[in-house]
C-alpha cells in the first residue's frame, strides 16, 4: 500500500507541473487580451515558468540528495500550491509573471525529487515497473492541461487554471504524511555547495533567457548575444569552482562516465527534436488547418494515452530485457511520425492524415519514456539520483528551447521566402510589399495592408497558409532528424554500470 502511495504522489507532482504549463499556453491569448498587454509581455507569463524550471532543476536535484527526497518534494508541492493561489489572485501582468516565476521554481524542486523518490523506494529489480507506473500516472494528468485551459477560457476565466491546482496540492500534501522513508535512499552528508548552486542557476538562466529571446529577436540581437556571453562566462567559473572546491555540487569526474555523457547528449537530441516538434503542433492545427483552440489542444491526447497504456508493460520488460531495444524502437517511431507530419498539406484532416503521424509519435513516446527515465536517474549512482534527475530534466528543457529557437528561425525563413515569391508574381506595390515583410514574424496571423484589392488579398491569403505549412514541414523534418540522431547514442547510453566504469 505504501509503495502505491509513493507512485501516486510522485506521479501527480510530476504531472501537475507539466499540465499547468500546457494549460497556461492554451489560455495565453485570452490572458493577453484580458490584461490588454502586448505579445512580448504575454509570452513572459509562460516563459518565466520555463526559465525557472530549467535553471533551478539541477540545484533542486542536488538538494534532494542532501536533504532527502520526501522533504524537498513536500517543500516543492507547498510552494507550488501557494504560488498557484498567487497566480489566480493576480491583478496585473507583473504580479502574474512574478507568481509564475515562483511556480516554476517550485516545479524545479518537485520534478527531480519525484523521480529520485521512486528510485529510492523500490529495489533495482522493480524500478522499471515502478517508473512505468509513475510515467502512467504523470501522463494521465498531462492531457488535462490543454483541455482545462480551453474549458476555463471558454466557460469561466483563466483564473480557474490556477484555482484548480489548490485542491490537488492539498490532497498531495496530506498523502505525503503516509509516504514511508525510502528504503534505498543513500542521502549524502557533504555540505551543500551554495556557490556552485548559484553559478549553475546563473549559467542555465542566462542561456535559457538567450534562447527564449532568440526565438523572437533572432541570434543577431545584442541582448541575446550578451545573455549567451554571460552564460558562457558563468559556466567557465562554475567548472573552475567545481574543480577546486572540497565538496562540489557536480563532481567533474562524473562527466567522464560514458553512460552519463551519452544519456545527456541523447536526451538533448531526443527532447530537442521531439518536444520542440510538438510545440508547433497546436499552431499547425489551429493556424494551418483551421481547427479550434480546444481541438488543437486535444490533438496530442493520443501521446499521453499511449504513455499510460505502454508504461507499465514497458517497465516490466525493461526489468527483464534491458532498455536497449526500447531506446532504439521509441525514437525511430517518433522520428517516423515527425517525418510524416513534414508532408503536411492544406487539405489534410486530423483523421486520418495528421492522426497517422500523431499515433507514431505516441507509440514511440510510450516506448522510450520509461527506460530513458530509469537510466537517467541511476546514471550517477544511488547517492546522486536527485542530481542525475535534475541534470537530465534541465537538459531536456534546454534541448527543447534550443530546438524551438532554431526551428522558429527555419519557419520564419521558409515563410518569408515563399511570400516573397508570391508577391513577385502578384506585382504588389513597393509600399505594400515592405509593410508585409516588416510584419512577416506574425506568420499565419499576418495581416494585409488596407490598400490591397480583394483578388490580391485572396491570393496572398492562400499563399500565407501554404507558406506557413511549408515552414512547419521543414520544422518537423528537422525535428525528425534530431530524434534519429539520438539513436546512435544508444550503445553507450545503455551501458551497464560495471561496463561504464571499466571504460
What is each of the regions a protein language model found here?
Residues 27-56, 95-98, 294-298:
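Extracellular/periplasmic helix-loop-helix junction of adjacent transmembrane segments
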Residues 54-55, 85, 140-143, 147, ...:
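Hydrophobic/small/kink-forming positions within alpha-helical transmembrane segments
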Residues 397-491, 503:
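Hydrophobic transmembrane architecture of multi-pass small-molecule transporters
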Amino acid at each position: 500500500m505504501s509503495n502505491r502511495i509513493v507512485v501516486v504522489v510522485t506521479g501527480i507532482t510530476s504531472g501537475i507541473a507539466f499540465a499547468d504549463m500546457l494549460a497556461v499556453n492554451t489560455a495565453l491569448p485570452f490572458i493577453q487580451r484580458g490584461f490588454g498587454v502586448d505579445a512580448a509581455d504575454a509570452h513572459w507569463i509562460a516563459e518565466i515558468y520555463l526559465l525557472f524550471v530549467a535553471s533551478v532543476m539541477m540545484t533542486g536535484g542536488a538538494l534532494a540528495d542532501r536533504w532527502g527526497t520526501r522533504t524537498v518534494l513536500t517543500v516543492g508541492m507547498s510552494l507550488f500550491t501557494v504560488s498557484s493561489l498567487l497566480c489566480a489572485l493576480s491583478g496585473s501582468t507583473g504580479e502574474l509573471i512574478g507568481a509564475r516565476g515562483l511556480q516554476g521554481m517550485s516545479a524545479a524542486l518537485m520534478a527531480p525529487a519525484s523521480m529520485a523518490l521512486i528510485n529510492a523506494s523500490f529495489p533495482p529489480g522493480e524500478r522499471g515497473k515502478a517508473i512505468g507506473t509513475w510515467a502512467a500516472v504523470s501522463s494521465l494528468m498531462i492531457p488535462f492541461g490543454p483541455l482545462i485551459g480551453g474549458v476555463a477560457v471558454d466557460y469561466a476565466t483563466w483564473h480557474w487554471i490556477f484555482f484548480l491546482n489548490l485542491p490537488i496540492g492539498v490532497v498531495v500534501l496530506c498523502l505525503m504524511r503516509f509516504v514511508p522513508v525510502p528504503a534505498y535512499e543513500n542521502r549524502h552528508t557533504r555540505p551543500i555547495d551554495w556557490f556552485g548552486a548559484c553559478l549553475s542557476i546563473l549559467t542555465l538562466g542566462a542561456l535559457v533567457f538567450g534562447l527564449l529571446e532568440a526565438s523572437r529577436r533572432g541570434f543577431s540581437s545584442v541582448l541575446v548575444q550578451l545573455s549567451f556571453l554571460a552564460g558562457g562566462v558563468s559556466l567557465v567559473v562554475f567548472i573552475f569552482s567545481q574543480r577546486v572546491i572540497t565538496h562540489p555540487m557536480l563532481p567533474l569526474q562524473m562527466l567522464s562516465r560514458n553512460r552519463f555523457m551519452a544519456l545527456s547528449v541523447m536526451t538533448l537530441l531526443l527532447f530537442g527534436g521531439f518536444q520542440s516538434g510538438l510545440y508547433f503542433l497546436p499552431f499547425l492545427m489551429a493556424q494551418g488547418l483551421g481547427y479550434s483552440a480546444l481541438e488543437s489542444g486535444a490533438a496530442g491526447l493520443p501521446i499521453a494515452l499511449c504513455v499510460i497504456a505502454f508504461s507499465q508493460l514497458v517497465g516490466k520488460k525493461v526489468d527483464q530485457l534491458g532498455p536497449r531495444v526500447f531506446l532504439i524502437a521509441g525514437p525511430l517511431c517518433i522520428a517516423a511520425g515527425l517525418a510524416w507530419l513534414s508532408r503536411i498539406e492544406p487539405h489534410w484532416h486530423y483523421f486520418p492524415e495528421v492522426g497517422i503521424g500523431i499515433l507514431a509519435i505516441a507509440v514511440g513516446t510510450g516506448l522510450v519514456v520509461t527506460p530513458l527515465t530509469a537510466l537517467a536517474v541511476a546514471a550517477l549512482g544511488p547517492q546522486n539520483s536527485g542530481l542525475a534527475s535534475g541534470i537530465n530534466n534541465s537538459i531536456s528543457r534546454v534541448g527543447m528551447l534550443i530546438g524551438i529557437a532554431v526551428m522558429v528561425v527555419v519557419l520564419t525563413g521558409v515563410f518569408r521566402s515563399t511570400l516573397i515569391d508570391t508577391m513577385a508574381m502578384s506585382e504588389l506595390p513597393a509600399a505594400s510589399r515592405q509593410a508585409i515583410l516588416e510584419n512577416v514574424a506574425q506568420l499565419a496571423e499576418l495581416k494585409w495592408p488596407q490598400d490591397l484589392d480583394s483578388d490580391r488579398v485572396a491570393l496572398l491569403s492562400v499563399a500565407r497558409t501554404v507558406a506557413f505549412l511549408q515552414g512547419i514541414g521543414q520544422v518537423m523534418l528537422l525535428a525528425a532528424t534530431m530524434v534519429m540522431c539520438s539513436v546512435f547514442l544508444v550503445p553507450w547510453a545503455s551501458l551497464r554500470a560495471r561496463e561504464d566504469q571499466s571504460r
